[in-house]
Amino acid sequence: MKNIKRIAVWSGPRNLSTALMRSFGSRNDFDILDEPFYASYLKKTGIQHPMFDEIIKSQSSDYKEVSEYCKNGYFKKSYQYQKHMTHHMINNDYLDFALSLKNVFLVREPVLVLRSYKKKNKNYDFQDLGFRQQFDIYKYLKDRFGLIPIV
């Protein structure tokens, strides 16, 4: 199996993560994995996001299966960019896959995140912004594995 170098970028919504992902995607040596835990999150929470049915049908909704794919899934190119939304991780049960990846935390000024999020979502909960989950995932990787992710 090809030795693929994998980058996991952990973000919350409205952090310009899609723009960064597209930038990496424009390179000819990168494959992209966009929000692989989205279906798992939707199925576990029952939240009716736009295109709920299509997402559930197009992705695995099993956290264990998705984490294994993030760690060992085959891709054609030498590098893989994984865009992860921190609020899609319900708990830290399936984060061990991140040990084998280079982890990066994308953080944007919270006031700008909130301002941008409020424009698109009138009803929201603080948990929807992913700040707490991002901190928890960072701390988990640091405390459990001794990793010092890039911020």
Residue ranges and their predicted role:
Residues 85-151:
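PAPS-dependent sulfotransferase catalytic domain
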Residues 48, 59, 80-82, 127, ...:
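Residue-identity detector for glutamine
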Residues 1-75:
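PAPS-dependent sulfotransferase catalytic core
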Residues 68-93:
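Glycine-rich phosphate-binding loop used to anchor ATP phosphates in small-molecule kinases
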Residues 8, 80-82, 149-151:
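Short catalytic-loop micro-motif centered on adjacent basic/acidic residues
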Residues 3, 75-77, 99-100, 109:
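Residue-level preference for short coil/turn positions at secondary-structure junctions
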Residues 10-12, 34, 82-85, 107-108:
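Short His-Asn-centered micro-motif
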Residues 27-30, 78, 100, 146-148:
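A generic structural signal for alpha->beta connector loops
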